[in-house]
Amino acid sequence: MTTLRFRLLGEPHIEADQRPLTGFISTKAQALLIYLVMSPGRHSRNRLANLLWSEFTDDQARNNLRTALSNLRGLVGPHLDIERDAVAYKRDMPFWLDVNVVRDTFGSRLDKQVISRIDEATALYQGDLLDGFQVRNAPIYEDWIL
């Protein structure tokens, strides 16, 4: 069973069994997969078509969605539940999503202020706490550092 890995914090990178997933027919096809994995639940085809192809007529948008779904079916078919009126990402299939790791760590509220604070903390990190700093004959202090 193929495991998909989604690294979306920063430049998007998607892997299937530890290899880059390639073969997307368009950026919008890739965006559709990203939207589905980040947005649990069933999504109507009309909503998805409007999400990505709102500048087209309804018929053109639905046709573009069909084409993108056909492409995704070939790339990650078992991970998608594609029905006549709705599409969903199957949560019971193996996948890893970096955004979920952050949400689980910091809570589901990732507003701009929280993200800014995470960026600040990341910029401050220069290495392990007191890396290379040693105090001789103070084993309790050294244990505390660890």
Predicted regions and their residues:
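DNA major-groove recognition helices of helix-turn-helix
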Residues: 14, 29-33, 48-49, 65-76, ...
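Short, Lys/Arg-enriched N-terminal segment that forms or immediately precedes the first helix
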Residues: 8-21
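Short glycine/proline-enriched coil/turn segments at helix->beta-strand junctions
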Residues: 39-41, 76-79
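Intrinsically disordered, charged and Pro/Gly-enriched terminal/linker segments
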Residues: 2, 22-23, 27-29, 34-38, ...
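Short capping segments at the starts of secondary-structure elements
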Residues: 35-48
